[in-house]
């Protein structure tokens, strides 16, 4: 530990305001633990940041937001990468480890509008902005009359498009708005019954080289075991379904003492079909529960829904 404290820890991050907030948050937590630690943020513009005129589902999904950061870890330009867990692909490059999952912020989706308080108050045919097929599916299940329009860009860009009148409402992650001090923009948090969160939503993950014991030891105190169990269950569910980050799959786990409850949904993009199920079990069985739930939804026809999407 002493040797790393005498060096500079390099954290890879995207340049968006939210990504920088997340990296700075981890930097501050580490420096509170290790006051002698020097930290440098190494900033990258990823492919996901560059390609803003095409829906994510058509250009490779949210993995485009992490590839450059992972390359920097592998070639030694960075020691640590901070990710929003909902952006992290199910399979990591060889040699890297998702070593720490930090305590979760609000996992729910947020309804944001300048005119109305909720979906119920939106007029027929109102325009709702989101880049998420998961949100689109669940919104259309409730309100098939709404026009769901793709919405890309960082949080500030998305809010500016709403303020310009391009949308009647937009849906964003509550966690991002809260982290950026924009809680006043949230009209209300959307109940999970209406919009079940994305796998990993609201949690931060720390990725590093799998064999770098100094870094692994350094970041270990930031791990939050209850969040880790929940996110591991969610990711196992998604991985078994072979779902990327841009498919109409929702997975959300909660923990009460040692009992883990995992809810999952798979739907069609048009919202006409939405399969739901849940499992419960001991937190030690997080991944097993994720696979069990995936199998239950596959038995309901989830595989056919996802195959239709990939074709």
From Swiss-Prot:
Give the sites modified to S-(dipyrrolylmethanemethyl)cysteine: 245
Q: Which residues form the signal peptide?
A: none
> What GO terms describe the biological role, i.e. biological process, of this protein?
protoporphyrinogen IX biosynthetic process
* Enzyme class of the recorded protein, top EC level: transferase
Which Gene Ontology molecular function entries are recorded, alphabetically? hydroxymethylbilane synthase activity
CDD domains noted in UniProt: PBP2_EcHMBS_like (cd13646)
Function summary: Tetrapolymerization of the monopyrrole PBG into the hydroxymethylbilane pre-uroporphyrinogen in several discrete steps.
Q: What is this protein called?
A: Porphobilinogen deaminase
Q: In which organism is this protein found?
A: Acinetobacter baylyi (strain ATCC 33305 / BD413 / ADP1)
Q: What is the lineage of its organism?
A: Bacteria, Pseudomonadati, Pseudomonadota, Gammaproteobacteria, Moraxellales
Gene transcribed to yield this protein: hemC
């Amino acid at each position: 530990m002493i040797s790393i404290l005498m060096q500079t820890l390099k954290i890879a991050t995207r340049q968006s305001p939210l990504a920088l907030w997340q990296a700075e948050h981890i930097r501050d937590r580490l420096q509170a633990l290790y006051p002698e630690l020097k930290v440098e943020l190494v900033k990258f513009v990823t492919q996901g940041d560059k390609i803003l005129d095409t829906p994510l589902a058509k250009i490779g999904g949210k993995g485009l937001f992490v590839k450059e950061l992972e390359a920097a870890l592998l070639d030694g330009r960075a020691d640590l990468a901070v990710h929003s867990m909902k952006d992290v692909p199910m399979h990591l490059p060889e040699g890297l480890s998702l070593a720490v999952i930090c305590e979760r912020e609000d996992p729910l989706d947020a309804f944001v509008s300048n005119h109305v308080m909720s979906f119920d108050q939106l007029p027929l045919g109102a325009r709702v902005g989101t880049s998420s097929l998961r949100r689109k599916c669940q919104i259309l299940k409730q309100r098939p009359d709404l026009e769901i329009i793709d919405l890309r860009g960082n949080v500030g860009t998305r809010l500016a498009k709403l303020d310009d009148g391009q949308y009647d409402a937009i849906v964003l992650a509550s966690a991002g708005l809260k982290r950026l001090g924009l809680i006043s923009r949230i009209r209300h948090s959307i109940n999970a019954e209406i919009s079940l969160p994305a796998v990993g939503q609201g949690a931060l993950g720390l990725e590093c080289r799998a064999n770098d014991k100094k870094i692994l030891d350094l970041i270990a105190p930031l791990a939050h075991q209850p969040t880790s169990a929940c996110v591991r269950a969610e990711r196992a569910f998604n991985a078994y379904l072979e779902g990327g980050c841009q498919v109409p799959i929702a997975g959300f786990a909660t923990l009460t003492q040692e009992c883990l409850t995992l809810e999952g949904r798979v739907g069609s993009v048009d919202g006409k079909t939405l399969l739901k199920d849940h499992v419960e079990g001991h937190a030690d069985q997080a991944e097993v529960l994720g696979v069990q739930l995936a199998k239950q939804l596959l038995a309901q026809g989830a595989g056919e829904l996802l195959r239709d999407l990939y074709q």
